[in-house]
Amino acid sequence: MTISGVLAGCPAPAKLNLFLHVVGRRDDGYHLLQTAFRLLDWGDRLDFRVRDDGLIRRTNQVAGVAEDDDLVVRAARRLQQATGTPLGADITLHKVLPMGGGVGGGSSDAATTLIALNHLWQTGLTRADLQQLGLALGADVPFFIYGRDAFAEGVGEAFQPLALPAAVYVVLSPEVSVPTAEIFSAKGLTRDTPPIRIADFAASPTRNDLQATACSRYPEVARAINWLEHYAPARMTGSGACVFAEVASEIEADEIVSLCPARWKAWKAKSLARHPLYGLLD
């Protein structure tokens, strides 16, 4: 909903990495990746109200995240500094996505903040401008601003559109938080997977190169994959901890979700062709 100075219920959708290959490492330590990003219809929501006094405030508490550390607040301040706008904002974050889950929660929240405030503040930045701002906040932020399924390379910021059929997924959180930096810095991590071409994506064998390391350090991730494998081929998304499986129907997804062990959480999610706020940057 939008009225003058307000955007309410702005979606911050989750993402899946349908595969994730580490194909090299730059001299500065950043890993070179190939991945297929997929948007989901499941995620957080944010409300924005413009302030005339220039203050950026998060109006609610988010467990375990101080206001100044929140990517939402940092994104708003970064846009404010980059554009010189005198305006501020009150931001309310309705958190659903698990933190440290590999579904892009914080990055998606930051991207939605950049898109929504660029619109409300009328700062006039382009999609490419916002992607550049977002990259400094997190490697996944540019994808959410890109706003559609993509084949990504580089450190995850170079995109090609990916045409994928609609799909239904079960996403399972084993209720552990996996620090991305820990997984990428692990000595045993595979860093030399041969690159594939986008044209070969559907026919090529793929995997998540981070999965073995995450499973060895966080056995609950391995247990979640093994459980979900009883119903459909499963793998980890991102650096974990969430795991997912594509299923044939919403009915099947609902049934699997209902059987999820009580110590974990599970959701049904459908694919999204485009980010719900995509049109704000057209």
Swiss-Prot record:
Reactions this protein catalyses: 4-CDP-2-C-methyl-D-erythritol + ATP = 4-CDP-2-C-methyl-D-erythritol 2-phosphate + ADP + H(+)
Binding site for ATP: 98-108
Pathway membership, UniProt: Isoprenoid biosynthesis; isopentenyl diphosphate biosynthesis via DXP pathway; isopentenyl diphosphate from 1-deoxy-D-xylulose 5-phosphate: step 3/6
Keywords (A to Z) from UniProt: ATP-binding, Isoprene biosynthesis, Kinase, Nucleotide-binding, Transferase
Domain of life: Bacteria
InterPro entries attached to this UniProt entry: GHMP_kinase_C_dom, GHMP_kinase_C_sf, GHMP_kinase_N_dom, IspE, Ribosomal_Su5_D2-typ_SF, Ribsml_uS5_D2-typ_fold_subgr
Enzyme active site: 15, 140
EC number(s) from the headed UniProt entry: 2.7.1.148
GO biological process terms, semicolon-separated: isopentenyl diphosphate biosynthetic process, methylerythritol 4-phosphate pathway; terpenoid biosynthetic process
GO terms of molecular function: 4-(cytidine 5'-diphospho)-2-C-methyl-D-erythritol kinase activity; ATP binding
Top EC category: transferase
Family classification: Belongs to the GHMP kinase family. IspE subfamily.
UniProt-listed HAMAP family: IspE (MF_00061)
Purpose of the protein: Catalyzes the phosphorylation of the position 2 hydroxy group of 4-diphosphocytidyl-2C-methyl-D-erythritol.
Full protein name: 4-diphosphocytidyl-2-C-methyl-D-erythritol kinase
Organism expressing this protein natively: Azoarcus sp. (strain BH72)
